[in-house]
Amino acid sequence: MSDETLAVALDTIDSLVPEMEWKTRAMARGLMRGYDARWSDQAERMIVCEEEFVVPIWNLANKGIKPSQSRTLKFAGKRDKRVLRNSSRWILDHKTTSVDIQDPDATYWRQLAINAQASWYLLAGHYEDLGAEGIIWDVIRKPAIKPKKIAQTMQKSVVAGNPYCGFDVSDNAQAYIVENGTENAELFELRVTRETINDPDRYYQRKPIMRLLHDMVDDCQELWQLAQDVLYSRRCNWQPCNSNACLTYGSPCQYLGICSGHDTIDSDNWRRREQVHSELDSIEGDGKNIITTSRLACFQNCRRKHHYRYDLGLERHGREPSAALQFGTTFHAALDVWWKAYKL
């Protein structure tokens, strides 16, 4: 990895995060520097980046001579990367999290071991004859640190021209310390970088997951059955509300006002999306007959929410994505730039 490529990845972060959100920008930049230090000598080489696919949904339990496929729905998604690892082909997917990933038996890894996205993306790859051995989870953990006040002795040391967290400091940062005695964006970024470089296994992990043929058969039938449930719910106009899903970590579902009778779908608070899968660029039409992992997760979480989001395409005007989603999207974009240096 050249310094120039890392610089482009950092510039990508700067272009996506406003300067006023300097804490988020510094966190992402420091985490990107640590990622570069951790994986710059990686063996993986990228075959393709951000690859969209659309495949049939098959029913292998069909009593006929041949398996049948859905005449209405198709399964679609976007692979982060396809890579070559030790002469074998793999699908690689990036994840950002704030929980423990260092312990191989951590809850996070147990959940990913049965993650539907991995199963169905590998299944789609099998339909496309990609020859993927499995999926590699490329997981990045955000450090649980914040900008802090700098001790007097450290202030004097840095102002005198000594490094901060092992890195040289600009004149502007020195002046900021003299005036404020706390970390600014530059200093916080350096501390995040040092934290991740000193403990790479805590913040960066890659784990390959393989699926056997009989597992993929089960995955195929699960996808088929869920797709049939989606169609049944649509045809019968049956979308029960899961009241246990109205609040997630204290944040209300965006459709709670409609479900509780305080709003209507025809009010000025809502607009109807022309295409219900904004993350996919290659989908033609409104996408309402396209099944994705995100859509099925929504359907399993609350069928009423699924109806509003995917059957009707309802979206609240001016709704901002969560901070976690914004951070993940920003870091993902920087990773795409970084990985270009490893393209075959």
Task: Identify the meaning behind each predicted range.
Residues 1-344:
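RecB-family 4Fe-4S metal-dependent nuclease core
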